Structure formats: C-alpha cells, structure tokens
Amino acid sequence: MEIKWFNPEDKSKSVFDAKEHSKSSHRENVDESLVPKRAVLFCMGKAMGIIKKYFKTRTIMEKLPGFITRSEVVVIEDNPTVCFLHGGYGAPQTADVVETLRALGVEEFMLYGMIGGFSKDIQIGDVTFPNRVYAEDGVSFHYGEAKEYIENPCPDIYSDMEEYFISKGHNCTHDNMVTSVAVFRQTFEKEEAWRKKGLVGVEMEGAGFLATCKFLGVKHYAAFFCSDKHPLSKDEKWVWRTEKFTKIQEKFVCDAVNYFLER
C-alpha cells in the first residue's frame, strides 16, 4: 500500500489549529510573554524530576495547553531564555507539544530522546546525533510526503554540542535509529532487519518531531541517549538498564540543561 497521507497541494486551513485550541475554553489562559523563544524537550520520564532536583526552577506553565499533552513547563531562575518540559510519550504527543509551543511563540526546539539499543555498536549512556531517522511512526507522514527516512538537520550546533558532551565524559556517536510506536511489536526479526539498514536503536518520538518542526519551518535539533540494550537473539534475556543507570541519566540531563544555559 502506498501511503499518501500528505498532499503538498492541500493549502486549506486546519479545522482547528494549536493556537485556536490553546486559546479555547477547553484550556487555561497562558501568559505568552513568559514563554521564551527556545524550548528543550526531554522525552524521558524522570528528566523533569532531575532538573528540579539539581536546578532552581520556576514554573511558567503548570500545564501546557496541548490537545493530548499537558506537560509542566519550567525555566531556570537565573536564565529564563530557554524552557524545559517533558516532550511526551510517542510521536503524536511530541507533535502536539511542538505545535502548541510554536503557537505560543517558540522559535527553536531541541529534543533529547531515549533509545533502546539493539546493536553491538552502541552502549548504555551513549549519546548519538543521527544524520537521519528511519520513520515507522505514522505522524511524520502527515507533515510531509511519505519517505523512509526523516533528515536530522546537522548545523554547527551539533559539532559544538558533541564537543561539549565529550568534554563532560560522554561517548558520542552519529549512528542512525528508527522511530516506532509499537513497543511490543519490536520482534527479533524486525530488529535484525533494522540492523541490516545500519540502525542501532529504537525510540518513539524522533521522526515525528523532526517532520513536525520541518513543516512548521522552525529551527530544530535532536539527540538521543541510550537507556537500555536489547538482546540480539532469543537465547539472551532482556535486562532493564543497570544499577548505575540512575547516575548516568542524571549526569546526562544536567549536562544537557547546562549546555543550553551556557549558550
């Protein structure tokens, strides 16, 4: 079946868009003057708790006025030029976050995601800056013509960011990954097929994030943190992370926040 969910000739208006929704009676009023032009999305469950633990934060939105995603949005007290929030679970939620923040005036987006590694070439704690993401998410096909890969723009910020993370002791790579939203259909056969494409891990938001940002015409970047390793054969057992993972994740989140506070 050929997927034709996006028609480049369709210039008609959305039935309702993120700005209309965020200002509707369905959602709380937001003081847009408090929303900075830069936003960092963490698609990892414990990131916001880590940020609040190690930084003095101020909440600028208790709930993002999204359609399906209601993340708390915070800034760091002494540097309110960038906001931080949970980016949602899965491509539909992340697209909602991006659309809503854009409607509130955000112009630059960074996504830090988490991948499950299924290759010998990536280890827990590695940070990868992929050139492109293999799309099996569905959302990306609504924001651009269907194609296998969604490009991850690689401006100078990646060289700078990689140098920064390496200086903080992180191992960095440029390996590509896949976005899939069917967690329990990541079979051994499917992951072997992904490996043959040169992919090293799987996550749930990247392709949708990249496609949404490109469609909206905003600056955007994405990097991914390896949270766990998948067994490479059915003879191995899947193990959820390691005892050291909490400290590894805390360091990554703090370094990721500081990168944007210093720039």
Residue ranges of each PLM-predicted region?
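Accessory terminal and edge-of-domain segments that mediate assembly/interaction
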Residues: M1-M110, G116-R263
